């Protein structure tokens, strides 16, 4: 098949490859075309750096996919930039780059204008005109990025779970605005938030300046639950959902909340706690379900069932199917989940390759059966 490789200069190279080619082979082909030694090449696809020993198929790279080529320069190096939110950015630089260049690279990656960036290394603020070498910044050093906001400032909000959120605010922001920013970041409705500073609960209509809250102050966030509590719901896929509930909520209400979060109709939900299936008309209190209890969610499918599909990479996908589904339908469901076109899928069960026109029932595939997915790569076309 053909794939494309795009360089940082914007040039695009076309390569003839097979799905079974490993990344080392691909780098050798790039060397043949462009003369760039493999050890100076870094290949990126879907935001991931590709490892030499893995194959194109491992990364689900298909015909006409585009890889990005970044040069790893001798005399060049990688450094890391850590933001106050804890995010780490990786930059390709040279010792001779000045701080202004580095800020431009950060702008390219993160969209933050250089004049709002302050870079700190070994406790010192770095000056634009100086170079990385001047500050003895070497490969894999970590710089710290602090934002310089016009009239603005950063404050921190600490939750009861110990998590710290960073907010960009101005002194003239009122507490209501701050709660809205917290909602944007964390999804907690303002009317469930209580903010505490210096032991005082903050009132919505007052501003940060009214409370003498200055840059890098820390507020404490307490959740105001109306006689309420949090419980957890664990699905068969291992995902855990957090719900805000009250002891007086009945099981039907809980299923409605799960539908709001996950889109699963209540009549397809079975909830289990302490080994018992919960009945719709009963309340959480009836079952002695208390704060931070974990319920288990099992899907009840109309004539339906769950099956598993295992890929060559070892990943297992869960599908909701019915015995009357034909193999073509199943491949479409896999495409919806994984993006793999049906014509590149071969499904194997009990050692047999499954034919598109036949149904799951034809092959006696029952609930919780495991199919194996093999990719069919069209040779080198």
Swiss-Prot record:
Ubiquitin is synthesized as a polyubiquitin precursor with exact head to tail repeats. Some ubiquitin genes contain a single copy of ubiquitin fused to a ribosomal protein. In D.discoideum there are 9 genes: ubqA: 5 copies of Ub and a final Asn; ubqB: 1 copy of Ub and ribosomal protein eL40; ubqC: 1 copy of Ub and ribosomal protein eS31; ubqD: 3 copies of Ub and a final Leu; ubqF: 7 copies of Ub and a final Asn; ubqG: 5 copies of Ub and a final Leu; ubqH: 5 copies of Ub and a final Asn; ubqI: 4 copies of Ub and a final Asn; ubqJ: 4 copies of Ub and a final Asn. There is a cross-link at residue 76 (Glycyl lysine isopeptide (Gly-Lys) (interchain with K-? in acceptor proteins)). One of its GO terms (molecular function) is ubiquitin protein ligase binding. Keywords: Cytoplasm, Isopeptide bond, Nucleus, Repeat, Ubl conjugation. InterPro entries: Ubiquitin-like_dom (IPR000626), Ubiquitin-like_domsf (IPR029071), Ubiquitin_CS (IPR019954), Ubiquitin_dom (IPR019956), Ubiquitin_ubiquitin-like (IPR050158). The keyword S-adenosyl-L-methionine does not apply. It comes from the Eukaryota. Coiled coil: none annotated. Ubiquitin exists either covalently attached to another protein, or free (unanchored). When covalently bound, it is conjugated to target proteins via an isopeptide bond either as a monomer (monoubiquitin), a polymer linked via different Lys residues of the ubiquitin (polyubiquitin chains) or a linear polymer linked via the initiator Met of the ubiquitin (linear polyubiquitin chains). Polyubiquitin chains, when attached to a target protein, have different functions depending on the Lys residue of the ubiquitin that is linked: Lys-48-linked is involved in protein degradation via the proteasome. This is Polyubiquitin-A. It is found in: Cytoplasm; Nucleus. GO terms for cellular component: cytoplasm; nucleus. Residues 381 form a propeptide. The keyword Ribosomal protein does not apply. There is a cross-link at residue 48 (Glycyl lysine isopeptide (Lys-Gly) (interchain with G-Cter in ubiquitin)). Signal peptide: none annotated. Belongs to the ubiquitin family. One of its GO terms (biological process) is protein ubiquitination. Residues 1-76, 77-152, 153-228, 229-304, 305-380 form the Ubiquitin-like domain. It comes from Dictyostelium discoideum.
